[in-house]
Structures are given as C-alpha cells and as structure tokens.
Amino acid sequence: MRNPGAQDNVSVSQGMRAMFYMMKPSETAFQTVEEVPDYVKKATPFFIFLILLELVVSWILKGKPSGRLDDILTSMSAGVVSRLPNLFFRSLEVTSYIYIWENYRVCELPWDSPWTWYLTFLGVDFGYYWFHRMAHEINIIWAAHQAHHSSEDYNLSTALRQSVLQQYSSWVFYCPLALFVPPSVFAVHIQFNLLYQFWIHTEVIRTLGPLELVLNTPSHHRVHHGRNRYCIDKNYAGTLIIWDRIFGTFEAENEQVIYGLTHPIGTFEPFKVQFHHLLYIWTTFWATPGFCHKFSVLFKGPGWGPGKPRLGLSEEIPEVTGQEVPFTSSASQFLKIYAVLQFAVMLVFYEETFANTAVLSQVTILLRICFIILTLTSIGFLLDQRPKAAIVETLRCLLFLTLYRFGHLKPLIESLSFAFEIFFSVCIAFWGVRSITHLASGSWKKP
C-alpha cells in the first residue's frame, strides 16, 4: 500500500487519532497510493496498550478483567494470521480497486479536495455495511467472517480476531467507488474504517448519549456480536449506524448480550477458528442432494436448509439463558503464562519481519512465516490440552534454534542472543521429555 518508509511520517498523535477517525482531510491527502502510510501497522502499539488498559479499568470497575488469557491469545493469533499475506502483496481490496481505476474510471475527483475525502468516507462506510450484511447472509462469505464472531468474550482483543479470507470477498463492495475516487483516497479510508471498529469492541463504555443516534458505538456493536435471538443479523455498521436505521437492520441493546457463535466451536486452535466453517460447508454441500440445493448451501444464509427461508428459521437459533459458561482452557496458569511468553517472542519477530520486508530475502520471510504459523498452532494445542501438544512444541523450539543458528531469526538486541539459545534449549529438553512420555504411553494417538 505504501513505500517502506511511509509509515514513519505518521506521528504518535496521528496514530492515535486515526483509530477514532479524528483526522483532517488536509493531513491525510496523498496523490499516490505509495505515499499512503500504513496506519494499521502504526496502530499496533496502541492496540496492545489499550487492551492492557481495558483489562485494568475493567478490574477496577467490575472487580474482574475484561477477558480471559486463552481467549485474548486466540484473538491476537487471528490478527497475526490475517496480516501474513500482506508480507507478499497488497490487500486484494486495494489491488482490485487500482485495476478498476486504471482501466474503467469514468471521471477523476481531485485527490486533495475535502469534498472527495468526505464523499469517500461515506462511500467506504456504505460499501462496508453491505459487505458486512452479505457476510452474514451468504454462507460462503460467512465462512470467512465467522472467525471474528467466534469469541465468547467481548473486549478490545476481539477486534483483532480477523479472518485471513475476508478480503477475498469484501473487495467487490468497494468497486463502484473506483469509477471516480482516486485509489490514494480510498486507501486512507479503508484503513480508518477498520481502525475505528477497534475501540467499539468493549463493555467498559456503556453508552455515548446523542452520538448513539449517528455513530456505531460499543452498545450497538455489542448487539451485533450477540447470539441472543434479538441480536442475530443486526447492526452491521462500520462507522455510521445510520445505514442500519435506513435499511431496517438496527436493534438497540435492551437485555444482557451473550457473545459468540450460536453453536460455539470450543477450541483455541487458530486455524480451526479460521477454517472450521469451510469444512462444514464442504461436508454439507456433498451431503445435500440436487444442484439447486447445493447452490443454496453456498449462497443462502448459514441457517438455511431445504424447505426453509433464505436466512433460516429464527426459532432454530438456540435460546440463551444468561447462564452460559464460555469455553475455557483447562491448561494450568503456568502453561498459560508460558504461552503468553512464547507469543510475545513470536510477536517481536513478526513485527520485525514487517518492518524489514525490503531487506529480508524471500527464503527468510517464508521460513519466518513457517515459524509464526507453527508457534500459533502450538499455542492453540497447548491451550486445548491436545495430546500432541508436547511433540509440536518440541518441534517448534527445534525449528527456532535451527533458524536462529542459520541467521534467519535474530533478536533485536544482540546481547540477548545467548539468553535466547539457553531458553529454547531448556524448552526443547522439557518438552522433549514430555514427548517421549506421551509416545511411550501412546496418548499422542488420541484426537
């Protein structure tokens, strides 16, 4: 989306204000896409800071943290996975937009006009509303979007639980703008629209008074994430709630919201979170007789079945009682802290990889991606207490040391090199012993 140095032009103030769409047209006007900063990348430290702040504030106000460690790690893992394709190419939303602009535009609005800026703000938000609505009403698109709804908690980390597949359907809804709005203006607003939706994933903020009439707020979005019957298929807005009010999909928060999918998946494995509904569609597609019914499996709602309305029957949605207990890891507190530590190590190399894509070789980037994916998989296995978790973690630590020795992974602080080697050597020994125990007992063969 931008040249490697573009993000350095974003000040701390701009990085924070971008998260609330509080930017002036004059400070976000760029002639080319290459000049547009990566505002999402710049916001990463703010994400982490605000997640920690929310935990503290929730503890003070409610006497308990706003989320559970296992769920927060799973949400952040999804966020990491969703951005890995950006190491190789622009998002499909921007790439397709540029193609249509260069080949089919009918007119060219001035890139530095405030009127263009505000029109694009409305256009992107309108496009997002319809994408988001279709993501709930078309099963094959829901297969991607459901990952975002899989958390049974509702906090700022939930905003990071993004789908790696979502951009492959969302791009269609922004194409009309490419007929007249310059790509550089679109590239700014597609990021701001996403960033705005971060802070509304919280229970700490209850209501915002008159702003509730116009803006999408935490209260409105809590309804959207609910699995109560009154919450289903409501409040699709990105920034402005007016679209829901206009098109009849608005619902006010009026009773306790129970979060998550109507049928919780009960896992912390990041790739199962991402792809489990695709597997469900695959098996349902082949088990459903008739071409028309197979077509409907893909393009009608997730609740559709033969003889049912397009979006399914509301009475088939499980009733909530308010006594639902979220799926929680049975792992020890020590193991959860270990998972956090390993996630933090991975995150350092993840951020460093994005910051240095221009100088790293393709081989190094690919190997780092393998390490990142294996780390997230292993953390999911550990939290789910899978029998194979010890074996996977042993292999992961061995991979780290191998990549480290060959120079594909290096700590930012050179003096920590020896400490890294010692730490991962101890991990290999610990998990290696547990792996041998599992292999000897045969427990690793269990699902």
UniProtKB/Swiss-Prot annotation:
Residues 118-249 form the Fatty acid hydroxylase domain. It catalyses: 1-O-(1,2-saturated-alkyl)-sn-glycerol + (6R)-L-erythro-5,6,7,8-tetrahydrobiopterin + O2 = a 1-(1-hydroxyalkyl)-sn-glycerol + (6R)-L-erythro-6,7-dihydrobiopterin + H2O. One of its GO terms (biological process) is ether lipid metabolic process. It is found in: Endoplasmic reticulum membrane. Its cofactor is Fe cation. It is a multi-pass membrane protein. Its main location: endoplasmic reticulum. A motif (Histidine box-2) lies at residues 145-149. One of its GO terms (cellular component) is endoplasmic reticulum. A motif (Histidine box-3) lies at residues 221-225. The chain crosses the membrane at residues 43-63, 111-131, 170-190, 334-354, 363-383, 413-433. Keywords: Endoplasmic reticulum, Iron, Lipid metabolism, Membrane, Oxidoreductase, Transmembrane, Transmembrane helix. It holds the Pfam family AGMP_C. Its EC number is 1.14.16.5. A motif (Histidine box-1) lies at residues 132-136. GO terms for molecular function: glyceryl-ether monooxygenase activity; iron ion binding. Belongs to the sterol desaturase family. TMEM195 subfamily. Glyceryl-ether monooxygenase that cleaves the O-alkyl bond of ether lipids. Ether lipids are essential components of brain membranes. This is Alkylglycerol monooxygenase. The gene is Agmo.
